[in-house]
């Protein structure tokens, strides 16, 4: 499991949002930074991505993923399959320690270096040390509130930050509208 962050993606109605907390933790007990941005817009702003894991590894993966998006003409599904395949098979890439959540207006995927490519059934996905808490909160908020995707993502991270010591309330969020 990758500690020191929580990333949540929510698709609801005409909106897809990815949100992440800002905490960077060194080791088990030192907070190094409170307001890091772990969410990026890619491919002319049509795709959003978030990472959990080593920062340098995440930047490498963002660059590789954007390259795959360009090669696929912006097709998120195809680019996600290609980055998962390359990540797993490349000797250098497979040593990278990170997870990605990538999304466009239609789909959300979790991508890992071991070859997993997961599209959630309910349009909600989370990664990182507080991921399970944020996921549970987002599912409840989605089912029992009228909040939009952005609001669900932010509120679920706030809930996770009250439980997970590696997650804080310095939240950044990116939204794509259909």
Curated annotation (Swiss-Prot):
Query: Which reactions appear under catalytic activity for this entry?
Result: ATP-dependent cleavage of peptide bonds with broad specificity
As one GO molecular function, the record gives: metal ion binding
Arranged from A to Z, the UniProt key words for this protein are:
Allosteric enzyme, Cytoplasm, Hydrolase, Metal-binding, Protease, Sodium, Threonine protease
Regulation acting on activity, per entry = Allosterically activated by HslU binding.
Q: Name one GO cellular component term.
A: HslUV protease complex
For this protein, what is the EC number? 3.4.25.2
Question: What is the top-level taxon of the source organism?
Answer: Bacteria
Tell me the active site.
5
Keyword check for Hydrolase, yes or no: yes
What Pfam families has UniProt attached to this entry? Proteasome (PF00227)
Location comes to: Cytoplasm
* Coiled coil location: none
Q: Where does Na(+) bind?
A: 161, 164, 167
Some GO term, biological process aspect, for this entry: which one?
proteolysis involved in protein catabolic process
Q: Which InterPro entries match?
A: ATP-dep_Prtase_HsIV_su, Ntn_hydrolases_N, Proteasome_sua/b, Proteasome_suB-type
Complex and partners = A double ring-shaped homohexamer of HslV is capped on each side by a ring-shaped HslU homohexamer. The assembly of the HslU/HslV complex is dependent on binding of ATP.
To which protein family does this belong?
A: Belongs to the peptidase T1B family. HslV subfamily.
Annotated function? Protease subunit of a proteasome-like degradation complex believed to be a general protein degrading machinery.
| Stored NCBIfam families | ATP_dep_HslV, PRK05456.1
Q: Supply the name of the protein.
A: ATP-dependent protease subunit HslV
Q: Which organism is it from?
A: Syntrophomonas wolfei subsp. wolfei (strain DSM 2245B / Goettingen)
């Amino acid at each position: 499991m990758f500690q020191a962050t929580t990333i949540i993606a929510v698709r609801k109605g005409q909106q897809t949002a990815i949100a992440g907390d800002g905490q960077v933790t060194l080791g088990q007990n030192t907070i190094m930074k409170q307001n890091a941005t772990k969410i990026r817009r890619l491919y002319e702003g049509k795709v959003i991505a978030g990472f959990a894991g080593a920062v340098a590894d995440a930047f490498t993966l963002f660059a590789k993923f954007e390259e795959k998006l360009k090669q696929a003409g912006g097709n998120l599904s195809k680019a996600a399959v290609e980055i998962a395949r390359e990540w797993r098979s490349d000797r250098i890439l497979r040593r990278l320690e990170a997870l990605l959540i990538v999304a466009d207006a239609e789909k959300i995927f979790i991508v890992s270096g071991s070859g997993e490519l997961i599209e959630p059934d309910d349009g909600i996905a989370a990664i990182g040390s507080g991921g399970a808490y944020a996921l549970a909160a987002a599912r409840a908020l989605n089912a029992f509130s009228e909040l939009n995707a952005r609001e669900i993502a932010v509120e679920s991270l706030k809930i996770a930050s009250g439980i997970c010591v590696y997650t804080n309330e310095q939240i950044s969020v990116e939204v794509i509208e259909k």
